[in-house]
Amino acid sequence: MMNKNKKLMVMAGGTGGHVFPGLAVAKQLQQQGWQIRWLGTADRMEAELVPKHGIEIDFIQVKGLRGQGLMRLLKAPFQIVNAILQARRHLLTYQPDAVLGMGGYVSGPGGIAAWLLGIPVVLHEQNAVAGLTNQWLAKIARRVFQAFPGAFADASVVGNPVRQDVVQLAAPEQRFATRNGAIRILVMGGSQGARILNQTLPAVMAALGEGYEIRHQAGKNSQQDVAEAYAAAGVESAQVTEFIDDVADAYAWADLLICRSGALTVSEVSAAGVGAIFIPFMHKDRQQALNADHLVACGAAKMIEQPELSVEKLTQMVRELDRAQLLSMAQKARQAAKLDADKVVAQAIIAITE
């Protein structure tokens, strides 16, 4: 059934972990005739990324409050009210049938403004620990979804919306069927890179010696330094890039992924069907470690928390994994995947607006 006159405003920003899942849901609704508009901030990644997907974006001025100085905290109530009023103006102009909050600072004022106008609010929490904004908005939302168990006591667990090119990869047993020779290691630190991975992996690869290939995504402005570190360690064959343009192709190539455990990364690893060693970013609520827990528990991944990371420990962990074990991990990752989160969330939005 087409919904030619229905409109959704997606509220998401700051990081790819919020924006990409929002785009996945938006595409599902566009295929059913919905009009989509975005609410974001002008100085974060959504300002450039969202229009590339053919979606118009409105901006409000809002920043996070954690770790701010006294003057910023004193000004905060006025800034929040101003952001709510800005969001309200955009909502009154666009007149959406529902709003979808995917997290990030922009979701707070946008969600409150929508609620005050009587517009249904739908939330999706990508992490195993709910962000502050979503904790607040969950009290006023019509539907709340979570990617992993534990963020909310009574929200539906649906996984994270994942890009279709990742979902559509061949099954691990097909990819591994003709592989022999060197174990293929993919290192990903996100768009900004992960300094600890950039510092540790050249020495790990040197210690592992022959029998391994590596592709290393080093992040913004780090490619040359990391490439030089590999060369200095005597690892001449390392392929070091700043970004990976085709992530699905990189997952398909890899036998083993070494990476952080941000919400979207964990969901993509599972959807792709790749065995992983997670090195969670240190955070006081252990958010990334908790994101990875379910894949570790089912045998699809291993984890070394950052305070315990050493060249020796990571080298030993990699050395213990042969291709048969990596195939088993990849199969378990794929079996654990929830591949229809975008469809489930889109269907809920349709249902509450009928």
Swiss-Prot record:
Keyword Ubl conjugation part of the UniProt annotation: no
Protein species of origin: Vibrio cholerae serotype O1 (strain ATCC 39315 / El Tor Inaba N16961)
Biological role: Cell wall formation. Catalyzes the transfer of a GlcNAc subunit on undecaprenyl-pyrophosphoryl-MurNAc-pentapeptide (lipid intermediate I) to form undecaprenyl-pyrophosphoryl-MurNAc-(pentapeptide)GlcNAc (lipid intermediate II).
Official protein name in the record: UDP-N-acetylglucosamine--N-acetylmuramyl-(pentapeptide) pyrophosphoryl-undecaprenol N-acetylglucosamine transferase
E.C. numbers: 2.4.1.227
Pathway(s) it belongs to: Cell wall biogenesis; peptidoglycan biosynthesis
Catalytic activity, as annotated: di-trans,octa-cis-undecaprenyl diphospho-N-acetyl-alpha-D-muramoyl-L-alanyl-D-glutamyl-meso-2,6-diaminopimeloyl-D-alanyl-D-alanine + UDP-N-acetyl-alpha-D-glucosamine = di-trans,octa-cis-undecaprenyl diphospho-[N-acetyl-alpha-D-glucosaminyl-(1->4)]-N-acetyl-alpha-D-muramoyl-L-alanyl-D-glutamyl-meso-2,6-diaminopimeloyl-D-alanyl-D-alanine + UDP + H(+)
Positions that bind UDP-N-acetyl-alpha-D-glucosamine: 15-17, 127, 163, 191, 244, 263-268, 288
